[in-house]
Amino acid sequence: MKSGLLKYALVAFAIFYVCNAQAEQREKPIFPYRLQIGGYGEVVGTYNFFSDEYLRYTDAKSYKDAPGHGRVDIPHFVIWLGYDFGKGWSLGTEVEFEHGGTESAVEIETEEAGEYESEVERGGEVALEQFWIQKSFTRAANLRMGHIIVPVGATNMYHMPTEFFTCYRPEGESTILPCTWHENGISFWGQAGGWRYEALILPGLDSDRFSSQNWIASASGSPYEFKIGNTLAGAFRVDNTSVKGLRLSLSGYAGNSFKNTLAPTESDRYKGVKGTVMIGSFDFCYNAHNLIVRGNFDYGHLTDSYAITKFNMSLRKDSVSPQQTVASDAVAGGIEAGYDIFGAIPSMKGKDQKFYVFGRYEYFDSMFKVAEGLNDSRWCGRQRVATGINYYPMKEIVIKCEYSHGFLDPIYNNEPAISIGVAFAGLFRRNY
């Protein structure tokens, strides 16, 4: 057994060595310049014409005529840095500040007998979204190792604010899937002709952090100083751009989740429970003749959802689990179309400015199917319609305005809102 594994390891090393030598002979830079710095960010202001009380779903009638509420947010600000070491080796990093980052301060409280107190000044997150080392053998064969993006679904692959029309990321995918989904792992990817392909090996999701409203969305990453790796998962993505202006994509994920917890149970009651997560996704983009049309459909299935729900509800109150019912199936689908009015005006053709009028429709339900004996939170399923404008004074900057309306089950109150935002995405400097 050991000798067989050693033999395979030596063969793999030999192949790697030969490919590496060939890449060194070419010595062609991976990036246009050795060092690249870029990023993206967005600021959004929203007024929601519905109550934000936490009981608005359990007691909908009491909040039917409740006043609305406004919010101003910095959903994402990201700094990206890439470096080409040469000989086919490169580095990619991305640091994300969500909702303005986080701040804390220590103060002396005069009303607390002069005691020192630590206070949270700003709520938010700072996260390392990408950190990988890549070896490029050829255009068709690249090996990426480290903290990488999991490109399942449209939004995880195309998540910059210039790649969707709405002020916030598409709500359906970002509700049921981790978004942006980033994880420690290994990725093999490449391009050949009109095809791009990628296969990944990752640690499994953590089933104790599955929830009703967000299904598996909060189960990637880790609340600890390390990522639990008791189970492994696989993911893939295939894109085809053979037709000019059209991209067609398939992606998917499969992996067990139940044992991927800090203290996995050994109880006979849960013997054989795996909590296998399976996700299939199709998305596309058409961009030609002043028209952009994008669409996606995602379907996910979780085995042993009943056992996982019961296990999570039995955990301690101070655990990382939300201790909620978890659905066996979740779904999200959406389509959006935008037309560039400036592109139809002769005097504006050939200029960087664009003015899109768009509409978007989506349906999603994080509790699409629920195992018998579990409560179904029907407010988790909804339709959402949005319409608005995107003005690009230049390619890297966009100003957005949007009206949206969320249509829930008739026993709940609908959720209309208006939003305005400004965003950028691009390289800060190009030559070093």
Which residues fall in each region the model found?
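Surface-exposed strand-loop-strand hairpins of Gram-negative outer-membrane beta-barrel proteins
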Residues: 31-33, 45-75, 215, 221-224, ...
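Outer membrane beta-barrel
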Residues: 28-48, 67-207, 230-235, 239-247, ...
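Bacterial N-terminal signal peptides that target proteins for export
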Residues: 1-9
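Solvent-exposed loop/turn segments connecting transmembrane beta-strands
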Residues: 71, 98-99, 178, 228, ...
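Outer-membrane beta-barrel pore domains
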Residues: 50-52, 63-66, 116-121, 131-134, ...
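N-terminal periplasmic/intermembrane-space "pro-region" immediately following the signal or transit peptide
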Residues: 5-6, 19-57, 431-432
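Hydrophobic h-region of N-terminal signal peptides that target proteins for export
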Residues: 12-20
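Loop-centered beta-sheet repeat module
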Residues: 209, 215-263
